[in-house]
């Protein structure tokens, strides 16, 4: 038996399987057979193939039959779903759904070849198809519509690690985070016709639907527990801050929760018209506070569609020289900014060393620049609200907790479109409220 390996040439790749079988993948524009297969796949997906499968799994679950699916293959699919966290796993689940759809619609199409084009400037396999186009137009929109996966609207195939110019196999070397080995095993099983693709697709969709139902029940329970907590407690700034801090520090991916907590407080302030002439910008996706997205910070207030106030959350980071220089570059293209700042989870280090540069930036751009801890920032916002006399401390503290909980419960997607999976965060918050 050979060891599975990939041979790469200037115009082709050759995947050598353990039994000596060689699969040839010629590079170049899509051939006529690939175009015909691709058209068939597009027609099926554009006329609702995936949506029909989702609705069948949701509305006729008693008619589902998974007897043809082995325990080993069920395990692979279960592990894919279980691997999804707020940081990893979503792209591989989305890709698995896409590959199963493709194979169910057109069994002759290889699901290893994820790029296909007629344009000579683009990399393409002659037998490949554009999985990125299929994802963006047909897969991600359906998964988002039925809340099966929290995905960016651009689609999971925009993930760089899925776009290498090599066929998908166990020797695909990109750094894919999540249940990589399970996904690889699934690809091999599909290509060997060891699974019936439509049955596997329905099983995977059923597991995602179960998870979605569980989330909705947990969201309702957490909101009910918060209501009971607020009725039984005379709430103030300290109590709400303590509860939210405890939740952040006991949860995974605390940096993202700190952003959500800050944005939630601003939501509460907006509800009480603390800044009546400004508009809170909807929460951005994780890691999007950069020049490419036109952001200055994680939290932004707009006036006449221009950013006038921005705060950037820095969890676990206390020395901010690089961040200050990045802010200076961003301010050059955002002349309307009047206040900007960094909010740290730790006390800022070597602040005396940074102050001259901060003062210089204030002078150049005519802004107020602040570096404060999360606790100090919360105090500033409460003081700001009380000075406006639009809400009492108790009202704002309660509204903050409500906004934070409802944001995580996916009840505020217009202002807080959180695409991170929130189940574990919500579970921990529910536990925290129950203890309180």
Segments (PLM) and residue ranges:
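Residue-level signal for secondary-structure boundary elements
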Residues: 88-92, 213-220, 274, 416, ...
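Terminal, charged accessory segments of proteins
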Residues: 1-191
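Charged, low-complexity, helix/coiled-coil-prone segments
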Residues: 32-41, 60, 141-150, 195-211, ...
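Catalytic core segments in nucleotide and nucleic-acid processing enzymes
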Residues: 3, 7-8, 249, 260-436
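Short amphipathic alpha-helical segments, especially helix-boundary/capping motifs
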Residues: 30, 50-51, 159-163, 236-243, ...
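N-terminal/domain-start segments enriched in small and hydrophobic, helix-friendly residues
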Residues: 33-39, 48-66, 202-206, 210, ...
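Generic detector of well-ordered alpha-helical segments enriched in charged/polar residues
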Residues: 74-81, 140, 180, 184-191, ...
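The feature marks a conserved, polyanion-engaging helical scaffold used by nucleic-acid processing enzymes
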Residues: 154, 162-287
């Amino acid at each position: 038996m050979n060891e599975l390996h990939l041979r790469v040439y200037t115009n082709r790749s050759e995947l050598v399987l353990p039994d000596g079988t060689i699969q040839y993948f010629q590079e170049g524009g899509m051939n006529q057979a690939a175009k015909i297969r691709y058209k068939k796949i597009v027609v099926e997906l554009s006329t609702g193939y995936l949506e029909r499968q989702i609705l069948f799994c949701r509305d006729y679950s008693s008619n589902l039959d998974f007897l043809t699916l082995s325990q080993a293959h069920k395990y692979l699919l279960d592990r894919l779903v279980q691997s999804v966290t707020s940081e990893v796993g979503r792209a591989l689940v989305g890709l698995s759904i896409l590959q199963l759809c493709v194979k169910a619609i057109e069994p002759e199409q290889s699901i290893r070849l994820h790029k296909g084009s007629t344009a000579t400037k683009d990399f393409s396999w002659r037998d490949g198809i554009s999985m990125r186009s299929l994802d963006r137009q047909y897969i991600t929109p359906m998964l988002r519509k039925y809340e099966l996966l929290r995905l960016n609207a651009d689609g999971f195939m925009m993930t760089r690690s899925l776009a290498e110019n090599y066929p998908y196999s166990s020797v695909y070397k990109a750094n894919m985070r999540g249940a990589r080995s399970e996904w690889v095993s699934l690809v091999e099983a599909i290509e060997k016709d060891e699974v019936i693709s439509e049955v596997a697709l329905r099983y995977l969709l059923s597991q995602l639907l179960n998870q979605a139902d569980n989330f909705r029940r947990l969201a309702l329970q957490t909101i009910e527990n918060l209501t009971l907590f607020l009725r039984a407690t005379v709430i103030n700034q300290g109590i709400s801050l303590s509860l939210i801090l405890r939740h952040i520090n006991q949860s995974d991916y605390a940096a993202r929760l700190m952003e959500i907590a800050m944005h939630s407080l601003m939501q509460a302030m907006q509800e009480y018209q603390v800044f009546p002439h400004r508009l809170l910008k909807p929460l951005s996706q994780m890691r999007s506070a950069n020049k490419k997205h036109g952001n200055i910070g994680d939290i932004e207030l707009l006036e006449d569609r221009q950013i006038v106030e921005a705060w950037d959350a820095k969890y676990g980071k206390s020395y901010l020289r690089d961040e200050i220089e990045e802010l200076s570059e961003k301010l050059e293209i955002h002349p309307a900014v009047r206040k900007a700042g960094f909010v740290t989870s730790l006390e800022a280090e070597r602040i005396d060393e940074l102050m001259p540069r901060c003062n210089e930036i204030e002078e150049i751009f005519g802004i107020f620049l602040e570096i404060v801890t999360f606790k100090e920032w919360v105090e500033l916002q409460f003081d700001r609200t009380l000075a406006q006399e639009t809400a009492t401390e108790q009202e704002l503290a309660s509204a903050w907790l409500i906004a934070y909980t409802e944001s995580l419960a996916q009840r505020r997607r217009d202002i807080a479109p959180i695409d991170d999976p929130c189940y574990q965060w919500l579970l921990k918050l529910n536990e925290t409220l129950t203890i309180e």
